[in-house]
Structure formats: structure tokens, C-alpha cells
Amino acid sequence: MRVILYSKSDCHLCDAFHFELLDLQSELGFAYEQRYLQKGDPLFAEFSGHFPLVDIETSATQPTRLIDLTSQRQLRTEIKQAAGLAALMQAI
């Protein structure tokens, strides 16, 4: 499983999600990357108003899920569900 956090500067929730994802990464063992977007970046305009965004890829054959979350509890739930799905897909 691979998780990408899309962040911007001066985003306290982005920072909180980053540290939550680091904790979850050590617990569940997924690949994690944080990408900072800035004004002028094509994705910044597309995602404007929707930070932080989390991109979860459970397997190479499954499409990624880009989700807009509003709490660390929501983030933890989504990541644990995705990790369970990724483990199930590996077993198949």
C-alpha cells in the first residue's frame, strides 16, 4: 500500500495528518510520501480549498482513492480499512 499526503504551507491540519501518517506507517508498514503544493502548481489550483488530501493506493491493479478528510480520526479509519484491503488483495 502507498499513501501520498498533499499539503500546503501554513496548514495545521496538514501537519497533524503528516504526524498521524508517520505513526500509522510505523504500525502498518506502508509506503508514505508527503508532497507540498504551492500557488502556481497545476494541482494547487485543482485542489484549492481541499487540503489536506490523501491519496491511497492499495495495490497496483486498484485505482488510487483521493480523499478529502477533516479529522485525524477519519484519516486513521480510512488508512486502516485500506491496509486491510491491501492485505486481503495480497492474499488472493
Pin down the residues of each PLM region.
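Local sequence-structure signature of Cys/Sec-based thiol-disulfide redox active-site neighborhoods
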Residues: 1-23
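N-terminal secretory/membrane-targeting helices
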Residues: 2, 27, 31, 89-91
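Short glycine-biased active-site loop of nucleotidyltransferases that positions the nucleotide triphosphate
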Residues: 44-46
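Non-catalytic, surface beta->alpha helical segment in thiol-disulfide oxidoreductase systems
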Residues: 56-91
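Structural micro-motif
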Residues: 48-55
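Thiol-based oxidoreductase modules, predominantly thioredoxin-like and allied folds used
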Residues: 29-41
